[in-house]
Amino acid sequence: MRPSRDDRDRDAYVSIPYTTAASEFLYGLNVVIAALKAKRRKMYKLYIHSRALTNPASAKTIRVLCKQANLKREDVDDSFLPKMDKMAQGRPHNGVILETSPLPTLPTKSLGKFGVTDMSIGIELAEQSAEEVQINGNPNSIPFHYTHTWRKPLVLLLDGILDPGNLGNILRTAHFYSVDAVAICTNTCAPVNLPVVQKAASGAAEALTILSIPGPANFITTCKKHGWIVHAAVAPNAASAMAGKKNLFTSSMISPLSRGPSILMIGAEGEGLRANLATKADANVGIRGVKPAIPELDVGVDSLNVGSSVAVLLEAFMRKPDNLEDVVKGTPREDDVAARIV
């Protein structure tokens, strides 16, 4: 139901308390708990309504995390709900809202060379303002999620993902598959710090390394010089039409992560990757569907949405080739296996 004129007039006069001009408000239990666990943001204040504490386990988790973070907590009643609604931009907040600094997103010019024994991924940062340095820091490397010995790093590059819900869903999928970093083209994608993106990601964005890419074409060119293998996600018919490119399909491909560090480029739903990025790929990757056996059931749905496509693609990239032995990190034979499969 649409808000009445009186409701809109009332909301216009509801003031929101900000600790800093750059403060953001995270809403929803899963997102707030994820942010408190990840500890990657500055935490200013937690607003919590009694209805958010009806689940004893959730209430205990919030109390423990607030104590660990030395976070100021304000218990509010129904009179504060108009402010909570405005903080959450009218979206469901479950009675819990966290005021924080923005999520770190590293403006990145290039990924560095990745050596056989490297446990992190070198990066070259673009210029940052003093305010950005306060949020992001000034690192020269990012973590490699070195859980299994058979694979090298995977970075997911997103171009043209304008829908905040799609972006959030992709971030959630990337976290599920332990992607090492998500690189977001800043001029063509929705802002990652939108609260609706964080909500759609269900807290997964808090655990991801996120790179902002101001110059994606130069980024890809330099990464290739540093030994990164670049793949473009394309429709199957587009893959076959691209002469001179190696064309892979998720159903039968051997993961390129067994050979070297890789970047997987994902384009906009419908339009796909921009040509200036697609032409830089070393190989194309497509997803083949299965045609209905009964012609009457073929209603013309011949593709997946971008979120579903990313899930299928990442499963293929993270699928260990059958001919490779794998040892989970921390076992005695880790170094021996790592040396043998590179």
Where do the protein language model's features map onto the residues?
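N-terminal positively charged helical leader segments and presequences
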Residues: 1-124, 334-339
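Short acidic-hydrophobic, aromatic-tinged amphipathic segments that line or gate anion-handling sites
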Residues: 26, 73-77, 207-219, 285
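Structured adenosyl-cofactor binding patch, chiefly the S-adenosyl-L-methionine
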Residues: 33, 173-177, 192-204, 275, ...
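Active-site/ligand-binding-proximal alpha/beta "capping" segment
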Residues: 232-302
